[in-house]
Amino acid sequence: ILLNSFIYFGFGYGIFNSNTKLDTYLGLFTLFNAVIHFVVLFFIKSKKLADSTLFYSTLGMVFTFITIAIPIQLDGSWVTLLWIAQGTILFWIGKTKNIPIYEKISLPILGLSFLSLLEDWSFYHYVNNLDIHAFWNINFLTGILAILGYGFVVYLSRKHAETEENQKFSPFNAIKSFYLPALLVLTAYLTFRNEIAYYFNYWLENSSLKGKEISEIDDYSLYNYDINVFKNIYLIAYSLVFFGGLALLNFHKFKNKVLGISAIVIGLLTLLSAQTFGLEELGELRYAYINGGSNEYFDVNFNYILVRYLLWGSVAFALWAIFKNTKFIIENTKFHIFLEMVIHISILNFLSNELVTWMDIAGYQDIFKLGLSILWSVYSLLLVSLGIYKKKKYLRISALVLFGVTLAKLFLYDISNLSTISKTVVLIVLGLLLLIISFLYNKFKDKIGDETKH
């Protein structure tokens, strides 16, 4: 029966597609196939002429032809929206009427709608950036409707998961519990990320100097490419806020372990990106601010420096949200220690970058290496103090490691380029810090000893 259905459809498709007068009706022909199978299905059901296998096979053919008819007859966002509507309605019927087959059919259709949405977004890479207005385009509307559709499906899934039947473990339920939230989270993240990118692409296109009476300008200088650097920083900041917010939402409302761990892992990867690629981009803007931007025709202002605080604020928020979520989701003490060390590394990274930035702006580029050595030494002292106060041995060990790295950097890299007076000042400062650390260890040795025994 199934083979006959596809053979009939294949011959019909070939006839319609080869005739220029009929090819516009391909979608209707496909929908007609769905109607025929629905009539057969109704007849089988009313007369009870076959077993459940034939019934569900015919039902599957009905939805298959409906699903195929949509992209054949329509294009663009309409395909995505109709697949979302079809999948959502099927899932709703399956859940509310307790018809599991509808629920199972809906999942691949929802997956197709997501792939169609990705295709819609990819098409916009070939459109003139001036034709796309951020947060005011068909892609954004489609994304919002997709979020609402997937959100409704996730809501239904969570609402009905409390019944005893659905609490039983099965591969389908296990896949569904991850698959549906993943669709929702990815769609929400990518929808707003794309709009931020569209905004900066529009700004870049508007910066064009084409048609302006400027002599001796090459193709590269036609655009203000510093805008791309701003875009990268804003996208990293958005990612940090999004996944930090997801971790916080999970902590306060959902308390889902899989979602929590996913938010933590992706958040940590984004933090790594912020403190490597993000810092590199901040360095590009700092250089542009000091040296006049990508070329002389574009304005350079203090926003080139201030944008760094958007990134660092996002880093701080993500760290705070991940830390709160981790205390609830992950009971492993070693991971808590790891996360605390990530926080201290981030703080030290921020302070070091601030020091380099402002010394560079002030014109003290020659001594920022020395400034970093002093900063790291002071921070190691703070870590020792905090480790003693909080009775955390790993903080004290980390402080000593940091101090050792600072000494190695000083003697192998910094001190050779310093004058005699500068060398004397640095060695005195480091000596004082060593004395303070030794004093703290001696003063609180009983407290440290009690901690070791414990």
Residue ranges of model-derived segments:
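Alpha-helical transmembrane segments of multi-pass membrane proteins
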Residues: 1-454
